[in-house]
């Protein structure tokens, strides 16, 4: 069986048709603890209950058995082959010794987190043909006694956490029109929140909340406003119907304000002169009332986007001091190459400042009051012309998450510098389920560039970069940081999983896995012993960027394929 991908000059995937599968390898731990709002908002250090460990998106753990003095002794204690090829991006999610992991193609594994023994496996029944540019998945959400996963055919499935059996299955949109889901859901307030991918397929983005018990729709908020809704005037004619603004990275949540924050993607088609206007709410952060879905506030990072710089990564909710005042900030290392600091409140998102953290030549200036950029017309793609710009469409940071450590006070960014792009703008006609970009792309590297990938550490109170580590390869590795004064990440084509000193950036430990790592790391403890976990499995845009760099550099980089969950600990 062949998965139907839309026609596009990108890597095509031949997917074997999947059939439903469920198995129980051994009894699941009988003391599975229900996941409540209280636990999600104040998780125990031993668990990793959500995508970034906490709903503020820090990617930080208070565990410190593994620290900067002993991490050199870290060793693998078990590994588990997923049996799946392609890019493995999901973090291992852990609740009281039970690990939940997803793979490309919508498999969900429940595993004994200490031993690596399989507890159950669920394989989603995908149709014989479905439309998706990427078949990856970014993980599960836990709530109550259920595990929630979102699928490539635009469904959300609730599974019994102890058995893996399906409880409910809800369709959120029609995959035939290019809607598909790769994100991990956000679970809070009795609701399961998801958006969809498909920004290159002429979709109209949205965020939908489903009842966690029944799967029934509670509310739906579109990220491109229709006539009569605020912001529709920023779209000419009927262009809002296919305007994009996809939501494909999990949101974060402020429990005191009752607001869920989500980032949105690029407009469609890619070239801005085909849809003049600001094109709200593309390339923005939205604050949604968790009860109603009402958009309470927004900030648009760049208007009338023409570079494919999705700003889907949700800002980190963290404290930042500015001019002697502590603010509740939203901090966002943008794909557009700027590091954004915003202030959040119950009914507003206000601009604080923005500075480039990689080389960027498309913005001529940024308004110091509003944060609205002014563009250099030489570097803004237009229809019928070929335009160069920096960074390339993959941006200063794509979706892999940054992290914040409150003990070092530093923000850690998986960045890419020294790469630029070329877009040839073309007219395009919308056809349901087909590519709707109107662009031909290339990648370039400035002469003399000695590296691409970086890990940057920033003190957001001073707005200064404290240290940087450079890699010859691009860096596609989400970051985990801990109370052990450590950061963990993969992301480079050399297959290495690394630990750095969180204060200085010194490399302390590395381990070569079976494949490149684009999975997001997590950490947890069982019976008082700390573990660090990550999925290896190269693919998706990281592999695409590797191929583009090889073309530019005249190199041939081989990265083995295949998904493996790796779990590390100190020797007993």
Could you tell me what each predicted segment is?
Residues 522-572:
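Blade-level signature of beta-propeller repeat domains, shared across WD40, Kelch, NHL, RCC1
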Residues 180-214, 303-364, 378-390, 394-399, ...:
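Repeat-solenoid scaffold signature
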Residues 194-205, 262-279, 417-448, 537-557:
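Short, conserved, GDST-rich strand-edge loop motifs in beta-rich repeat architectures
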Residues 159, 205-216, 278-293, 343, ...:
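Beta-propeller blade signature
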Residues 80-93, 121-141, 166-184, 201, ...:
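Extracytoplasmic beta-rich repeat domains
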Residues 26-76, 223-230, 373-379, 444-445, ...:
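Blade/loop signatures of beta-propeller domains
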Residues 57-173, 481-482:
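N-terminal cofactor/phosphate-binding cores enriched in small/glycine residues
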Residues 48-52, 87-107, 131-156, 180-204, ...:
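Repeat-blade elements of multi-bladed beta-propeller folds
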